[in-house]
Amino acid sequence: MYRPGPLNLITDVPGLVVGHATDERVMTGVTTVLCQGDWTGAVDVRGGGPGSRETEVLAPENFVDVIHAVVLTGGSVFGLAAADGVTTALSHQNVGLRLSPASLAIPIVPAAVLHDLTNGGDKAWGLNPPYQALGRASVATASTTFALGAVGAGRGAKAGLIKGGIGSTSLDLGDGLMVGALVATNPVGSVLMPDGQTYWAWPFEIDKEFGGHRPGASDPVTDPLPELGRLRAAGRLTPGANTTLGVVAVSARLTKAEAKRLAMMAQDGLARAIRPVHAPFDGDTVFALTGGTADIGEGTERLMQLSRIGSAAADCLARAIARSVYCANSPST
């Protein structure tokens, strides 16, 4: 039986650290994944209202095949400035590409945003949004251990009509292959079945990581868009006002095309955990990070291993989504 890594976090994948920065007054924040060493990245965007930066550089046809960090942030378009802060902090640490010996270090730092501008926090920042400073602060706090729930990019998030947040999980596939996921959960859809207690992702749960609740004997009522009236009243039915932002990682070096396939397969984790998902109101975006020394072979063997990794990444992402909401709504948060 496959088990999570020691931390049950994306940082069980060697070479990754995660940092949060949270502004309680504004009810927003930034979560950054730092890639230490040699990493390749890709991204897959499925939602109808995404907000992002530097995602095109990750496309398989483009020449840059390294990545230094991924930024998940609140703040909608204002939040994209968080990547400026992360980029500046990393360049100051001499992390990044150099196009000439005299060049500044140029970090490759893609970012994606979620909308939390109507969550009740103080957004009267005038000409000084907090996100660049939050980005720098997230680099300073990066570690292999980090908080889950209403923190960082998940501080002001909503999952349907309840609190969303940050979640993370991992899965050890053996033979040196570790898969992990990180998510900021802010969808228009629901992560809970109609009983209001059981997560749609329950079949994938390990060790009661999101409460261990199981559905009753009766079949669930499968409303295509649960709580439609309340979502409309809460202003959630606006394109771009919701999203789920994910990062999956594996301890094997893949090509950019293979990393893209990994990101695409991992999107299935959203469909396993949220109903509905990939809606016009969402900006669902999943990044894939690949780096490490695990050998996945060549030819048909490599394709089989990539399929296995992609399936595990989807499961990890589904678990992370449920865990994010569970932690955000626990009595201690």
What is each of the regions a protein language model found here?
Residues 1-77, 81-84, 92-333:
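A structural signal for small-residue-enriched, beta-sheet-centric alpha/beta enzyme cores
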